[in-house]
């Protein structure tokens, strides 16, 4: 649950907190109770200090004003631009404005902030409210768990109260939209928390503990398969990757099952709690960031909280194959051959291409057991995705044009854009092995696509989406609502995807 309390104010003039915020577009229209703000805007526009352009910000102190207009110590005017962008772009600009609110609050160490939600031409209040609230809460995120309390001065710990007021009337529908935005932001921040945890603070068993706790508090069904059960079921990928580690692998399953669901959706997330590369050891520089190799697992688990609270008419199953990839004495070696759940054999050419090995078992198991209508998997799978798309788009591979359309809409709405890559027979040939059914590396060319081709072997004919979030899960493209570090990417896209179905 968010540390920030979100409340609603009938009249912004009665707010006596640290910071009062007015997001304003160019040439805004002011309602009757905004006369004083209109006067301030007109003076600032005349002097060239503020005109409402996108990204503009002016901080005023109430004590400097000739006439007191509220009890807040400071007033912040933020520019929204002309508001002529397409709906998804405008939505993300509003989200970024919310992030800027959080940044400005941090600069002055404000803990109580009120945002007056504007009425923009051609947009409903709900369309403005949701991304603004998301942006503030996502932008206010910080991970301070391991900061010593002996430090002086104490670090700023973010907003305690986010108050909302409206230029127009507030009603129950807007309250629900506000709660919806809070939930999506909370889930995204929970995924960031998991990714921030070091390898010694988040092990495979932490995934299972978190899932069990979530199941208990939200009436979900949780099942955890351990090493003994995996051996019996022939999950050679997950078992093989875990061989070099002292941590026991876990296959964590969460189920939400309404009566008479319209669809069944299987979500699988890579839960590699630390990736050294195994025997195919990674370079030392930057290896500390390999704690983030479980961001796919974090996304699917945290999205289940939103599913459980919103109760869509869709059955949703989340599976996280969790382990770490270490180079201990029993570790997989290049050239080893493993057998996946269902019997497909694989030649392990490179032990640092381990994500597809653990996902394959989880996908095969989930498809067989739950017979889903749709399968989605998320993984920080390939460096090739970063080479292809940088840190601005998540790579998407699919066997279904319809699902790609749904995923593209969901990603755009969440501010987490995706870009589809092809998957044709030429790429499938790259993973053919001379000694097994397939091999886990298809050479340097098209690494993101050949990794997806590997996973495709385990989903049968089920419509399927593969999200390679390697480039977007950490230090995602510069956005004001995404602080440095893990972004939580994928969590809100999954939430929007399920919302579109249910």
UniProtKB/Swiss-Prot annotation:
EC no. given is 3.4.11.1, 3.4.11.10
Q: Kindly list the positions annotated as binding Mn(2+) 1.
A: 275, 352, 354
Q: Where is the active site?
A: 282, 356
An annotated GO cellular component: cytoplasm
Q: Does the keyword Cytoplasm apply?
A: yes
- Molecular function terms from GO: manganese ion binding; metalloaminopeptidase activity
Summarize where Mn(2+) 2 binds, as residue positions: 270, 275, 293, 354
Q: Which InterPro entries match?
A: Leucine_aapep/pepB, Macro_dom-like, Peptidase_M17_C, Peptidase_M17_leu_NH2_pept, Peptidase_M17_N
Give the cofactor note text: Binds 2 manganese ions per subunit.
A biological process (GO) of this protein is: proteolysis
Q: State the needed cofactors, names only.
A: Mn(2+)
Catalysed transformations (reactions)? Release of an N-terminal amino acid, Xaa-|-Yaa-, in which Xaa is preferably Leu, but may be other amino acids including Pro although not Arg or Lys, and Yaa may be Pro. Amino acid amides and methyl esters are also readily hydrolyzed, but rates on arylamides are exceedingly low; Release of an N-terminal amino acid, preferentially leucine, but not glutamic or aspartic acids
The listed locations are:
Cytoplasm
Keywords carried by this UniProt record: Aminopeptidase, Cytoplasm, Hydrolase, Manganese, Metal-binding, Protease
Q: What's the top EC group for this one?
A: hydrolase
Q: Which family does it belong to?
A: Belongs to the peptidase M17 family.
Per its database record, what is this protein's job? Presumably involved in the processing and regular turnover of intracellular proteins. Catalyzes the removal of unsubstituted N-terminal amino acids from various peptides.
Q: What is this protein called?
A: Probable cytosol aminopeptidase
- Look up and give the organism this protein is from: Desulfotalea psychrophila (strain LSv54 / DSM 12343)
